Amino acid sequence: MPSFDVVSELDKHEVTNAVDNAIKELDRRYDLKGKGTFEFKELTVTLTAEADFQLEAMIEILKLALVKRKIDAKCLEIKDAYASGKLMKQEVILREGIDKELAKKIVAHIKEAKLKVQAAIQGEQVRVTGKKRDDLQEAIAALRAYDSGMPLQFNNFRD
């Protein structure tokens, strides 16, 4: 029976490259030169700046760098800014994997579409199986049109 997996993964090397590009862009910007920093540790980027508006500009720089590296900005979870001495800090978490709640929503969306496929949750991925390849392609089209709040990839397509 043909099947495929719905996953949400990040290429960690591309994320590292995107953060490095954001750091370089921060050094090039005249209005932000020497006023802010990016720190990247295990899918968490900590932004440090002197003012709130600088943090917002830094978030836009980070989003642009990620998009240039073909990483969807939907995976960003932006926390609230907080004061740390004279500086403002903000954490941006890069989300990866499909949690149980999102997996249930994906399965429900596939069932609502009334396609001739079955969806099953398997850890951090959703396996979709069907009798025909065309049914699976319809399921992929339905999931691409669905706004899940996370970037979804489709892999492990088997006949």
From Swiss-Prot:
Keyword field contains Nucleotide-binding: yes
A GO MF term: nucleotide binding
This protein's record includes keyword Cytoplasm: no
General function of this protein: Nucleotide-binding protein.
Keywords: Nucleotide-binding
Family, as annotated: Belongs to the YajQ family.
Domain of life according to the entry: Bacteria
InterPro entries (alphabetical): DUF520, UPF0234-like_C, UPF0234_N, YajQ-like_sf
Name of the protein described by the UniProt record: Nucleotide-binding protein Psyr_4087
UniProt organism field: Pseudomonas syringae pv. syringae (strain B728a)
